[in-house]
């Protein structure tokens, strides 16, 4: 229900700003892969590859870079909504009911959240991974014994830590 509430509100922003906010960094990032072929480390290579890759898929399949950008943006919206849901769910599990409702209102009503969810910049994805790394660290501190016994916890932590490397 938490995820659905976020998706409904942010989905309106996605539809209003389809295929997403394509900013100056995104232009430079996609030029590296789609036009020049000269890839530099000025922007995170993985983010540049994902953004360009989805745009190329959109062009190949639908004859539209915009559709590819829209698919990338949709996946980004879903990922950021998942990260926001994890924060809200964490607060609810810990019994912070008032803080949960405040957080939900903040995620749903503060425009910057849904604008950043459709903004195709590396900062948006970095923010989502930063939230997930922070939640993982809190979970480690809460469960000092037994956290590392579960290999799935290690896999999740390495994944979110690696994903947080989308920012220089």
Q: Model-predicted segments: where are they?
A:
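Membrane-interface junctions at the ends of membrane-embedded or membrane-associated helices
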Residues: 1, 92-94, 138-155
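Transmembrane signal-anchor helices characteristic of membrane glycosylation enzymes that use polyprenol
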Residues: 1-22
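Extracytoplasmic catalytic/substrate-binding loops of multi-pass membrane glycan-assembly enzymes
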Residues: 17-31, 38-54, 62-67
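Short acidic/glycine- and proline-prone juxtamembrane loop motifs at membrane-interface regions
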Residues: 24, 115-125
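Specific aromatic-rich, kink-prone transmembrane helix
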Residues: 34, 86, 126-145
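Transmembrane-helix motifs of polytopic, lipid-linked glycan transferases
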Residues: 74-94
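Short helix- or helix-capping micro-motifs
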Residues: 100-111, 164
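Membrane-interface alpha helices of multi-pass inner-membrane proteins
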Residues: 151-168
């Amino acid at each position: 229900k938490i995820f659905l509430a976020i998706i409904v509100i942010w989905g309106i922003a996605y539809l209003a700003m389809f295929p997403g906010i394509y900013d100056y960094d995104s232009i430079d990032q996609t030029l590296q892969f789609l036009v020049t072929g000269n890839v530099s480390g000025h922007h995170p290579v993985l983010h540049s590859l994902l953004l360009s890759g989805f745009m190329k898929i959109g062009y190949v399949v639908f004859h539209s870079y915009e559709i590819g950008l829209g698919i990338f943006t949709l996946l980004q919206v879903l990922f950021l909504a998942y990260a926001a849901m994890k924060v809200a769910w964490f607060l609810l599990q810990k019994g912070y009911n008032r803080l949960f409702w405040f957080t939900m209102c903040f995620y749903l009503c503060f425009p910057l959240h849904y604008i950043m969810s459709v903004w195709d910049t590396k900062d948006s994805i970095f923010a989502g991974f930063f939230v997930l790394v922070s939640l993982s660290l809190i979970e480690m501190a809460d469960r000092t014994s037994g956290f590392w016994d579960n290999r799935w916890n290690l896999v999740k932590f390495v994944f979110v830590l690696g994903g947080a490397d989308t920012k220089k």
